[in-house]
Amino acid sequence: MERLLIVNADDFGLSKGQNYGIIEACRNGIVTSTTALVNGQAIDHAVQLSRDEPSLAIGMHFVLTMGKPLTAMPGLTRDGVLGKWIWQLAEEDALPLEEITQELASQYLRFIELFGRKPTHLDSHHHVHMFPQIFPIVARFAAEEGIALRIDRQPLSNAGDLPANLRSSQGFSSAFYGEEISEALFLQVLDDASHRGDPSLEVMCHPAFIDNTIRQSAYCFPRLTELEVLTSASLKYAIAERGYRLGSYLDV
């Protein structure tokens, strides 16, 4: 049985090094999809590069943890900036859900202004869309707009019912991440999904060239290792050998 494999590179627009890495991993590797941060410092650069790479499917990386929001979010920002304190607010059940709903719509419209089309799908920076309080908002929005949504089904039991017309891959893996990146790790992710019987799988990745912005990230040099693995000719062969077809959320 042929299975669908979506290799999605997060953080398009984070920095020029990130952008170049994603384009390289698409052009000469197995990355088929990316998600863009519309408030990223290099988003205009990402838009420019994407024009020369029409085969790259582009979704939206909803941001609630970094940079400046597009709308006024006094309930989530500090000194006008988003940050990781969102976890504390979630634990205290103090998330400003109306502000988050408005910000989602604004980022979505900004994406369309930048790229001239709808995103192929939605996910989020640091997976915040999987918070039980936020997931229903994002799931409903994706279903209404007719676009797919990244779903990590492990914490989904706390996220409520899915809209009937919501599209997603059957499987999702964030395991291709960390200090031990290798071709063997990527293939283990595929084998695990095959054993579960998932007919479609998204694998998250972060290929990048190192620049000053990436150097400031807690996840730095493994991004370059990811790029090396994702552009390996032997990996593409091994994927096909396992019965996977490379595609995007447009195929879901």
Swiss-Prot record:
One GO CC term on file: cytoplasm
Residues that hold Mg(2+) according to the record: H61, H125
Superkingdom per UniProt: Bacteria
Cell compartments where the protein resides: Cytoplasm
Cofactor(s) essential for the protein: Mg(2+)
Class of the enzyme per the UniProt entry, highest EC level: hydrolase
Entry keyword set: Carbohydrate metabolism, Chitin degradation, Cytoplasm, Hydrolase, Magnesium, Metal-binding, Polysaccharide degradation
GO biological process: chitin catabolic process; diacetylchitobiose catabolic process; polysaccharide catabolic process
Pathway assignment: Glycan degradation; chitin degradation
UniProt EC number: 3.5.1.105
Gene Ontology MF annotations: chitin disaccharide deacetylase activity; deacetylase activity; metal ion binding
Gene3D superfamilies with a match to the protein in the record: Glycoside hydrolase/deacetylase (3.20.20.370)
Reactions this protein catalyses: N,N'-diacetylchitobiose + H2O = N-acetyl-beta-D-glucosaminyl-(1->4)-D-glucosamine + acetate; diacetylchitobiose-6'-phosphate + H2O = N'-monoacetylchitobiose-6'-phosphate + acetate
Biological role stated in the UniProt entry: Involved in the degradation of chitin. ChbG is essential for growth on the acetylated chitooligosaccharides chitobiose and chitotriose but is dispensable for growth on cellobiose and chitosan dimer, the deacetylated form of chitobiose. Deacetylation of chitobiose-6-P and chitotriose-6-P is necessary for both the activation of the chb promoter by the regulatory protein ChbR and the hydrolysis of phosphorylated beta-glucosides by the phospho-beta-glucosidase ChbF.
Oligomer and partners: Homodimer.
Family as reported in the entry's similarity comment: Belongs to the YdjC deacetylase family. ChbG subfamily.
Name of the protein in its database record: Chitooligosaccharide deacetylase
Species, as recorded: Shigella flexneri
Gene from which this protein is expressed: chbG
